Amino acid sequence: MVNQSLKNKKIIISAGASGIGLATAKVCLSRGAYVYLCDIDNKSLNKLNKHPLINKRLFKYNCDASDESQVLDLFKKINKKTKKIDALINNVGVAGPTGSLEKLNSKDWERTIQVDVNSHFYFTKKAIPLIKKSRNGS
């Protein structure tokens, strides 16, 4: 018997085509949720077509979470599918540069901030109006 604790809940997961994001998506799907999954890796997104847990409750989108205009486009697409969401899982992140600060490349540092900080801001800002419509989202 499937645990229905997420039955018909609508959940957005960033960076969901592999790793922790994919594992989270599988759990949500197995519990009856609709999952709106995005990832920058189109190849990994396409591999999901063959996965047994992937069904009519999964909507996949290619999106660079660190690009505000792509996040805006993503939410426009999601808004066409649903007028509310129940949860946002900000999963996107990269391992930042390591080593001596003196040798740190500014471009690598800026990319890390863009992905690990700004993307979460973009997603959360766009998700809030949809979560408010659910009246019990998180």
Locations of the language-model features?
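Conserved glycine-rich Rossmann-like NAD(P)H-binding loop of the short-chain dehydrogenase/reductase
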Residues: 31-47
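A short, exposed helix-loop element centered on a Lys and neighboring polar residues
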Residues: 124-125
